[in-house]
Design a protein with these regions (language model features):
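Nucleotide-activated sugar donor-binding and catalytic core shared by glycosyltransferases
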Residues: 1-439
Length: 439
């Protein structure tokens, strides 16, 4: 009852916010048009498997599983739904699903209408997706429903005395495929025992991304300091890296202003490094802000640069989307932004390239970041001084390694190898899920 009242106010809030926000307006329109789209596209004779992801990150977690099912069980069709425009707008043309739409707001009527239209044979909810009305109707209809790559913490409402009523939504799942033993322990503590610890499917996904990495001539020219010959152009993923570098390259991914204040200050003073900056927000105001902070360095923007211009530059600013996961392959050290704000972004996309990963202090809720720290492949900084000490150590170790010969293992190289080994050691979650689901 209380949940449905809250949903009603959420619905009203979205309707009002849609008048002022283009992003919310897209979501509001997409959710209202979902039933129209489903009526047009659902094949009444087909068997659908429903995947729901809140946004782009959760989609990437579920993608290895979707693609395995599509390959090994072609008798099923895939329905993919999103809650957020940041997921739907980017992946609305994804070829791995037969139908892609927004998930309607979680009212009881919407849940009944949706499930009557689609009639899924099973459903997969990725990570933090616990929509009470949809889940209760799925259970009522005896539709197998799985939570994949979910992770639980003791401070979540399900495990508090005042959250017992809402914890009932968890009992709607047929099975949980969780990331760690702590999640299993917490679920068992409230009487939920159909739980398997399989790890995080994101590890499988970043390995896939690395294998399919794009060759980026501008980044190659930037890294080498010369335009690569066409006959040498190759996938960035070859042997885990692009060809041998002449310059030390630092790659900052998904950076925010507090991150940029730290590393730009360092590289203004240490000009032996080349820097790739892929900011989280690529609006003109933010790009101009970044440019204003850089002093005494030649800067080019990716969309405006030629390989010849990139070869002569000191700083390459990425002013477009879709390249970051491949771009890490051209670096020596990675920095993942967000740690001085709401939380760090994807560290695995960098670590898979066998490179040390630096991030800010807001990382405690990110299990993969904690794993990188413990493995010796990740490094937390709390400000400029920490960053300076760490980068100088990386720079010295790289120089010593080059002068000592190939048999010497530097701090930079060993840290990168530990990061890559950490990712490789935790792959395989998709296989474990596939083995447990009855198709």
């Amino acid at each position: 009852m209380i949940y449905n009242i809250v949903i009603y106010f959420v619905l009203c809030g979205i309707a009002i916010a849609s008048l002022f926000s283009k992003k919310v307006r897209k979501m509001w329109k997409g959710e209202r048009e979902a039933f129209k789209l489903l009526k047009q596209k659902v094949d009444p004779d087909a068997k659908y498997i429903w995947f729901h992801a809140a946004s782009l990150g959760e989609f990437e977690q579920g993608r290895p599983l979707m693609e395995r099912i599509r390959k090994e069980h072609p008798q099923y069709k895939i329905l993919l739904t999103f809650f957020s425009p940041s997921g739907y707008e980017v992946r609305k043309n994804y070829e791995g699903a037969d139908i892609i739409c927004y998930m309607p707001i979680d009212t009881r009527l919407n849940a009944i209408r949706f499930l009557c239209l689609v009639r899924p044979v099973m459903a997969f909810f990725i990570k933090y997706e616990f929509w009470s009305n949809f889940l209760h109707i799925l259970k009522y209809r005896n539709i197998p429903t799985y939570s994949v790559s979910s992770i639980f913490r003791e401070d979540q409402v399900f495990f508090k005395w005042y959250g017992k009523s809402y914890a009932g939504v968890l009992r709607c799942f047929t099975r949980f495929f969780v990331q760690n033993e702590e999640s299993k322990r917490l679920l068992e503590g409230i009487g939920i025992t159909d739980v398997d610890v399989v790890g995080d499917t994101r590890f499988d996904r970043v390995l896939q991304i690395k294998e399919a990495a794009k060759y980026l001539p501008i980044c190659e020219a930037f890294r080498k300091g010369c335009v690569p010959a066409e006959d040498k152009a190759s996938d960035a993923s070859a042997e885990g890296k692009a060809s041998e570098k002449d310059y030390k390259v630092f790659v900052a991914g998904s950076s925010w202003p507090p991150d940029e204040d730290i590393f730009i200050r360092f590289f203004n003073a240490h000009k032996d490094w080349r820097v790739i900056i892929a900011p989280h927000v690529i609006g003109e105001d933010h790009l101009k802000q970044i440019l204003s902070k850089i002093q005494g360095r030649k800067v080019v923007r990716y969309t405006q640069a030629t390989p010849e211009e990139a070869a002569k530059a000191d700083v390459l600013i990425i002013d477009c989307f879709g390249l970051l996961s491949s771009m890490y392959g051209y670096g020596d050290v990675a920095y993942v932004g967000g740690g001085f704000g709401v939380g760090i972004h994807n560290t695995l996309e960098a670590a898979v390239w066998n490179m040390p990963v630096i991030f800010g202090p807001n990382n405690k809720k990110f299990q993969e970041a904690q794993g990188l720290l413990k493995s010796g492949g990740g490094f937390e900084i709390n400000g400029y001084e920490d960053f300076e000490v760490l980068m100088l150590r990386f720079a010295v170790s790289r120089s010593e390694n080059e002068s000592a010969g190939s048999d010497s293992v530097s701090f930079l190289k060993s840290s990168g190898e530990k990061a890559g080994a950490f990712v490789a050691s935790l792959s395989g979650a998709t296989d474990k899920v596939m083995a447990k689901v009855n198709f």
